UniProtKB/Swiss-Prot annotation:
Underlying gene: rplQ
CC annotations in GO: cytosolic large ribosomal subunit
NCBIfam families the UniProt entry points to: L17 (TIGR00059)
Stretches with biased composition (Low complexity): 134-168
Complex and partners: Part of the 50S ribosomal subunit. Contacts protein L32.
SUPFAM superfamilies on file: Prokaryotic ribosomal protein L17
UniProt protein name: Large ribosomal subunit protein bL17
Region (Disordered): 132-202
GO biological process: translation
PROSITE patterns membership: RIBOSOMAL_L17
Start-end of Acidic residues biased regions: 169-193
Protein family: Belongs to the bacterial ribosomal protein bL17 family.
Species: Mycolicibacterium vanbaalenii (strain DSM 7251 / JCM 13017 / BCRC 16820 / KCTC 9966 / NRRL B-24157 / PYR-1)
MF term (GO), any: structural constituent of ribosome
């Protein structure tokens, strides 16, 4: 169940506060910036940004929701045709509040609330800094991968050479064994031949 915000209302009643915020939002969308008291500016900011979010979606339902609060059709047209598309790539923070000198007479704290129309130098610098940091991180990661792969590549030829030398040694041993067997069989054949000759002589 929705409940009213705690604390005093602007204007003294709920209906007066709704009308006050609607009129302030209409003036803000029409002129781009307005000067009002600081409490009114802080109350207007979320109210106006929700209307801008409706304008970004741009459907008929959103237009009818905005028309419930902003009764000036020309201002609604500007909101949906210009302001909404301008903030299409921005996910929030469509307005800014700047404190100014207190009002003469009653010394009320004053502020200027305006639409953020320009791209600030700070945001551009932050974006460039983040891009540079991402590139440096990517290059550092690539260097680490290359450095890790180099020792493995150096170890692999050594392992191949070791395996080749082991295979060569095994082949030499097998060859020596075969030669020894051949020599033994040749000696046995010679001995058998000599025995046969001796028998023939007898």
């Amino acid at each position: 169940m929705p409940k009213p915000t705690k604390g005093p209302r602007l204007g003294g009643s709920s209906s007066h506060q709704k009308a006050l915020l609607a009129n302030l939002a209409t003036s803000l969308f029409e002129h781009g910036r307005i000067k009002t008291t600081e409490p009114k500016a802080r109350a207007l900011r979320p109210y106006a940004e929700k209307l801008i979010t409706h304008a970004k979606k741009g459907t008929l339902h959103n237009r009818r929701e905005v028309m419930k609060k902003i009764r000036d059709k020309d201002v609604v047209h500007v909101l949906f045709a210009e302001i909404g598309p301008f903030f299409a790539d921005r996910s929030g923070g469509y307005t800014r509040i700047i404190k100014v000198e207190n009002r003469k007479g009653d010394n009320a704290p004053m502020a200027v609330i305006e639409l953020v129309r320009e791209k600030t130098v700070t945001s551009e610098a932050n974006r460039a800094r983040r891009a540079d940091a991402a590139q440096k991180a990517a290059s550092a990661g690539a260097q680490e991968v290359t450095a890790a792969a180099a020792p493995q590549a150096a170890v692999e030829p050594e392992a191949v050479e070791t395996e080749a030398s082991a295979e060569t040694a095994e082949a030499e041993v097998e060859t020596a064994e075969v030669e020894a067997v051949d020599e033994a069989s040749a000696e046995e054949a010679d001995e058998a031949t000599e025995v046969e000759k001796a028998d023939d002589d007898k």
